[in-house]
């Protein structure tokens, strides 16, 4: 019985890895459809960290785990692999943390 379950688990995992679509049945959004979306990058490595929301011309709201010593915030991105003319990059001057209790 354990061998059968192990084989079923391996079969299921190997099938799941073959899927090439990230979102099943999804469509690519239009350019500037989500213009309040911000992408946060680590300045030193250039790695994508997480997303945020532009809630004011000078404020981006993110989750607490997005904190790094030096961040780059990119706005106006449609595809992170393609650079567009209206993309903007900013560096935060201050960071604020609010604890929910």
Curated annotation (Swiss-Prot):
Keywords: Blood coagulation cascade activating toxin, Disulfide bond, Glycoprotein, Hemostasis impairing toxin, Hydrolase, Protease, Secreted, Serine protease, Signal, Toxin. Residues 1-16 form the signal peptide. PROSITE patterns: TRYPSIN_HIS (PS00134). It comes from the Eukaryota. One of its GO terms (cellular component) is extracellular region. Gene3D superfamilies: Trypsin-like serine proteases. The active site is at 65 (charge relay system). Glycosylated. Residues 23-101 form the Peptidase S1 domain. Strongly inactivated by diisopropylfluorophosphate (DFP) and phenylmethanesulfonyl fluoride (PMSF), and to a lesser extent by tosyl-L-lysine chloromethyl ketone (TLCK). One of its GO terms (biological process) is proteolysis. Its EC number is 3.4.21.-. InterPro entries: Peptidase_S1_PA, Peptidase_S1_PA_chymotrypsin, Serine_Proteases_S1, Trypsin_dom, TRYPSIN_HIS. GO terms for molecular function: serine-type peptidase activity; toxin activity. Expressed by the venom gland. Residues 17-22 form a propeptide. Belongs to the peptidase S1 family. Snake venom subfamily. Thrombin-like snake venom serine protease that releases specifically fibrinopeptide B from fibrinogen (FGB) to form fibrin clots. Shows a preferential cleavage at Arg-|-Gly bonds in fibrinogen beta chains. Cleaves fibrinogen beta chains preferentially to alpha chains. Monomer. This is Thrombin-like enzyme okinaxobin-1. It comes from Ovophis okinavensis (Ryukyu Island pit viper). The lineage of its organism: Eukaryota, Metazoa, Chordata, Craniata, Vertebrata.
């Amino acid at each position: 019985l354990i061998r059968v379950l192990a084989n079923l688990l391996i079969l299921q995992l190997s099938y799941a890895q073959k899927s090439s679509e990230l979102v099943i049945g999804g469509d690519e959004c239009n350019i500037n459809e989500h213009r309040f979306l911000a992408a946060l990058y680590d300045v030193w490595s250039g790695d994508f960290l997480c997303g945020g929301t532009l809630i004011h011309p000078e404020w981006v709201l993110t989750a607490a785990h997005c904190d790094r010593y030096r961040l780059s915030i990119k706005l106006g991105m449609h595809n992170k692999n393609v650079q567009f003319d209206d993309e903007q990059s900013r560096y935060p001057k201050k960071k604020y943390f609010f604890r929910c209790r």
